[in-house]
Each structure stands twice: as C-alpha cells, then as structure tokens.
Curated annotation (Swiss-Prot):
The keyword Mitochondrion applies. Keywords: Mitochondrion, Phosphoprotein, Stress response. It is found in: Mitochondrion. Its main location: mitochondrion. It holds the Pfam family MBR1. It comes from the Eukaryota. This is Mitochondrial biogenesis regulation protein 1. InterPro entries: Mbr1.
C-alpha cells in the first residue's frame, strides 16, 4: 500500500476565527477579560460588572411571596440579598459570646437584633422588601476604653514636662545660691550678666514683690534661679569674661557695693577739660552702658576711667564699673566722641 503524506494547509483568517470561536469556554473568558482590561483599564464598571451580574441573578431567583411553611418566621429574619456580605459580618459577630461576657448576654443581643427586624411584606411598607442596612459595631465597645485612651497621652505629656523642669533646675550654672526676691535692688543678674537699671521707688519695689509672689512657677528660696530665661554662659564659654565680683553682688547689692568701695582704694582724677558738657555726659554714658565685664588684673590699657568726686557718687546711683580699667572699645568710643 502506498502511504499518502498529508500536508497541512495554512488556515485563512476566517478559519482561524472559527477555531477560536469553537475553543473552550475558559479561553474565551480569559480573552474577553484581557481585551476588556487592555481596552479600558481605568474604567470602574469593569471591576463591578461581575458583581452586578451576580446581584441580578440573586434578585431574579429571590422569592418575594411569603410561604406557609413553619420556617417562614426564620426566613423573614434573614437579611436581604441586597445587603453586602461584608456589612453583615459585624452583626453576625455579635451572636458569638464575648471574652468577658456569657452566653446569656449573647442571647439577649440576638433577641434585641431580631426585634428590630420587620416583616418585609407588611402592609405598612407597601408590600415591598425594605432595603435595610446591617448594624455595625463600633471599634470601642465601652466608654471606659475611650477614657483610658484619652488619659494616657495626657500622662505622657505631664511626665515629659516634669522631667524637663527637673533637668533644667539641676543643670543651672549658678555658682552661689541667691534669694528669689530682694527689695530695693537696682541690678538684675541673668546668668552672670549684669543689667543696670535706675534705682526703683518704694512703690515700684512693692508692686514687683507682689507680682513675683503671685507667680505660680517661681522657684523656692533655697534653690538658685533657673537658667531657662537667661543665656547659659557655660555653653558658649563666656565664664572667663565675667568678673568674679558678680557673685558678691548677687546676695545683697547695697552691702557688697559698700564693702567693695571700702576694700579697694579709689583713684580720684579730674575729668578732661572740655568746652561743652555734652561730650562729658556722653563719655560717662558710654562707659556705663558697656556690657563687657573683664576680670580684674587684665592689662588692656593704662588709661583709667574719669571718675566723679566722692560726694557726687554717693548721692547718685552706684557705679559698678568704677574699679576696672577701660577696654579698647571704650577708648575708641571716647576718642570718637571727643573728636
């Protein structure tokens, strides 16, 4: 016998479409799904199309007429198929007993849920099923949990603030404990820096005492003044520029000034002769307004500050910079005013 060799002919486009159309159902579904996703990937209807078809199928197969069977009461309490499954899950979770509760509490919950379900074919609702949304449980089941969650951050904030206050008091860089308030003071010390002011009146000192006593955040007298407001000199290395006599002025300024004037002899020199009195007043003002307090013994310059007579110094306000030499800045200011 003679075997004939079969040759495969190329298929036309119509034959290929027929073969694809006669293919299995899974291939067609995959092809349709692929084409749908490629043609319109941003369409939201593509994602919900299958769900809509399932919902229509459930509605078509749902029996809206009540049955006369004894299980009719149970069937009436079932959820409507229009409700989504994920919404019905929290309501079903209420049927299970809680960790701390008992089975009787769970049964009472089911009775309360069943009492809220109405007959879908009642005459009050027009004989149509009511589209009821299933009840969902809140995240916090009791008010005590809400109170505890609100109190915890408050406790954390309070502990953090108290810790900062304690650390600030312990790390204060004062070398001598000073009283909190003193009357008749004409100087203020903020972390080893003197701020000069005019001599206060008796009324002003009493008002300042009352105002400072009324403050709730004032430190006790035994402790030193906190450095939260002033500039910390120990951080910037400014302690070497501060005179050691500042500590003696902090306890009682008036007594320390008298002691300083008695221990250290003062040199009385006449002021430079000048035609106008404005330059002398500007010189004294520039000398008293300088904020640099160099320690004693620094040989910055041999030129001494012009001082007033002893009688005028006792009558006027005390001069704290009388015992030190003039700096280069003060000399340059004096020469600029004199010229």
């Amino acid at each position: 016998m003679r075997m004939e060799k079969t040759t495969d002919k190329p298929l036309s486009a119509g034959d290929m479409n027929d073969e694809y159309s006669r293919g299995p159902i899974d291939d067609i579904d995959c092809l349709n799904f692929f084409e749908r996703a490629v043609q319109d990937p941003c369409c939201e209807a593509c994602d919900t199309e299958d769900a809509d078809e399932e919902l229509r199928a459930k509605l078509s197969s749902f029996n809206f007429q009540p049955d006369s069977s004894p299980c009719n009461a149970k069937c009436q309490q079932t959820l409507n198929p229009l409700c989504k499954i994920d919404e019905a899950l929290p309501a079903e979770s209420e049927l299970a007993p809680s960790r701390n509760g008992s089975v009787s509490e769970a049964n009472s919950d089911t009775n309360s849920i069943a009492s809220t379900v109405h007959d879908p074919v009642d005459s009050k609702y027009g004989g149509m099923p009511s589209l009821r949304k299933a009840k969902t449980t809140s995240y916090f089941t009791s008010s005590s949990s809400n109170n505890t969650t609100m109190r915890n951050p408050l406790k954390k904030c309070n502990t953090n603030i108290n810790g900062l206050l304690v650390n600030g008091r312990s790390s204060s860089s004062s070398r001598q404990s000073i009283p909190e308030l003193f009357s008749g003071a004409c100087t203020k010390k903020k972390n080893n820096v003197l701020l000069k002011s005019e001599t206060p009146n008796s009324e002003f000192s009493s008002n300042s005492l009352q105002h400072c006593n009324s403050r709730s955040f004032s430190l006790p007298r035994s402790r030193s003044r906190s450095s939260a407001i002033a500039i910390p000199t120990h951080l910037y290395g400014l302690e070497k520029y501060v005179s050691p006599e500042l500590d003696t002025l902090t306890a009682d300024p008036e007594e320390s000034i008298e002691r300083f004037s008695n221990n250290r002899p003062r040199e009385i020199s006449s002021c430079c002769p000048n035609d106008t009195g404005d330059t002398s007043s500007s010189l004294s003002h520039s000398n008293t307004s300088s904020s640099l307090n160099f320690p004693l013994g620094t040989n910055t310059n041999q030129f001494h500050q012009p001082r007033q007579p002893v009688q005028q110094q006792q009558s006027s306000k005390p001069n704290f910079g009388a015992g030190r030499k003039k700096s280069f800045i003060e000399m340059s200011l004096a020469s600029s005013f004199a010229g």
